[in-house]
């Protein structure tokens, strides 16, 4: 979600250079649309560049492609309307906020026949933020879990619950997410509460639990959790499932004498979903729908998954994957493992302020 800060590589010169070559222009050029263009606003490192090239070749539509780093950076750009993007890829809770503030256009699904390829499991998940599935088409999904190093954690001590992150045996070896909602999700779930609670008493209880945990935490991190865990710098870390294929490949390529295992805690976790939406002021709406439809083609969705490694909600693409991918439970967990999980919801500015103030207290304590 984010929110998905772990997937953000937008700051790398390589990513920016390659995308600028593809688009031929940046945000300043996105102020004027034409029938032969589509203006795309997406996370960094979140599409196979050859997919963009193939779309341009097949449709004759020029893709102007810009990057954002967080949902919170993206939202005011769309709200202000000065830069008229045609298609954007926000996360669940931010899509809800955009719908509530009339920032999105309804998608004409007659122009997106490949929507049928999206597994009903994920269209049902979408209803938590897009109740009638009018405004969004799922692109990628995943979970948040605990990664642990088998050389630093004995089998009998392997974490199975969020509450294990308060165990003294992991002192100075815990990596927590440096994100208000993700940190509070861990605490709230360990207390048996909803990660979308609006109850001030529950939020405060979670705050006190996070403060209690601080002496055990080595660091609050974002992107660094992946490399720190691969480097054996910590025993356990909170991480997004989309990182797992990269991590597993790195461990293998480096010939490490340990493995890094991923666990979805039994209290449940955050199920996140990033989806394509069309801003209400889009000037190339039909081209945006062609873009979405193209990305829903099973062979395109498979190709894209193999590049970005974040789980695809496309059932046709899943059927085309190598069995090693299909059977990787860190990436595609069984449904029963997810029974107690939730999708983040937009809680409103007042409740957001409660969380933000509580997080400030945690970090400053």
Predicted features along the sequence, with ranges:
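Mature extracytoplasmic/periplasmic domains
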Residues: 279-339
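A bilobed periplasmic-binding-protein/Venus flytrap-type ligand-binding module shared by bacterial periplasmic
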Residues: 145-152, 189-192, 272-284, 303
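Hinge/lid segment of periplasmic solute-binding proteins
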Residues: 75-76, 92, 96-141, 155-163
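Short, low-complexity disordered leader/linker segments with a strong preference
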Residues: 1-37, 365
